[in-house]
Amino acid sequence: MKKYANDRGIRIIGDIPIYVAFDSADAWMNPELFAFDEDMNPIEVAGCPPDGFTADGQLWGNPIYDWEYHKKQNYAWWIRRIRHCEVLYDVVRIDHFRGFDEYYTIPYGMTNARIGEWKKGPGIALFHEVKK
């Protein structure tokens, strides 16, 4: 499809969401990439803290990455993910880019995002690996 579009002067922009779903193939095939307990339940999940728009914050529920594991693997999963998207799209946009700098975690099982904490993400190190 990309070649067909490109041959007609059309460029395709595609999105990569920063997080995958708990019940995704990525999470179940690669549990070591995520902060899961021994029963494969998330230890914490993604979201946003309360703000002027919502007193409860945003509880997205996606599992949180084990960034230390990703770092030890030189971010190989992320590199494969981005490279695959480069085949499909001319421009790749990563949704919630800020989450690579800092991300908000909520203990698994909470019904809102009032209780949570900001943690440091991989930062520019991940993108240096992607660029290699």
What are these regions (language model features)?
Residues M1-D7, R11:
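Active-site pocket-lining segments that scaffold enzyme catalytic pockets across diverse folds
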